[in-house]
């Protein structure tokens, strides 16, 4: 669901004072469990329900979670605050990270890398730039990339002492983490309502795009391929996008390279170590119309898209689940026997050290 930022400052305080839940996993897992089932773990420890977001397995991500159960997985949720660790990932086969509105701590980043290199799979689901649900100056693309736009040297730039010293910011260090480890970076663009048929063939996507003819976006971003030996794009935006097709609230030009391959992939995959990763530039592709929570700012029901059922979105996600669940011996895209991508052409302000914040946040 795409929102304009109308949350009050009360929400910032509430987010910074989240109480850590002693139990690592939530009790919302409803499928029968047994020792042979593998576990998909959904992160809900980085403000995944802030603002209009409702990215939980018994809320607006329930269709997605149910599709995984139908593939034989046990689906659980990771609650608390900044709870990703070697221990919390120990029993997981796949880690799903929807829109993280709080940044990852260094130990969490290390745990994710260890998890993937040792054979686990992770999927990062982000959104358009400026989708700052909890008004903490950091949106999901920035959290996942590892640095804040315009604050690469210091992620706490312009924060007051309460924000700087909060539990959320403790042990958070700015870096180009996602690109350095996975070979991709979420671009800070913002595209509008678009259906795309610009899809890589099944044979060049490890079967992920089989049966997928069209995929939708409702205000989202694309990614940059920064290391083709590690990462590959599989879904792209249409060619020749115009200014009118950017998100209406974009704070810059919104569309960076006119769409197509040069805009970077909307959906990408990566192979490192024994494991693998996937990346999606819009939560609307995944969500459904069954939000669980009310908005914190006004107490009204949240409104979400029925994206899982749109176009071939559900088919794509099912295929991604299948691919992420397979173990493979190759440790990079270079070893996978497919044609490698070219690096995505970047604008100067997209270099982390050259990035600027077009509009002060929040």
Describe the role of every protein-language-model region.
Residues 1-10:
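Bacterial N-terminal signal peptides that target proteins for export
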Residues 195-335:
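A glycine-centered loop/beta-turn motif at secondary-structure junctions
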Residues 18-32:
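Sec-dependent signal peptide cleavage junction
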Residues 20, 108-109, 262-265:
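Short alpha-helical segments and helix-capping/turn motifs at coil-helix boundaries
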Residues 10-19:
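Bacterial N-terminal signal peptides
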Residues 129-255:
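An acidic, glycine-rich "communication" segment
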Residues 29-167, 277, 282-287, 294-362:
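Long alpha-helical segments found as membrane-embedded helices
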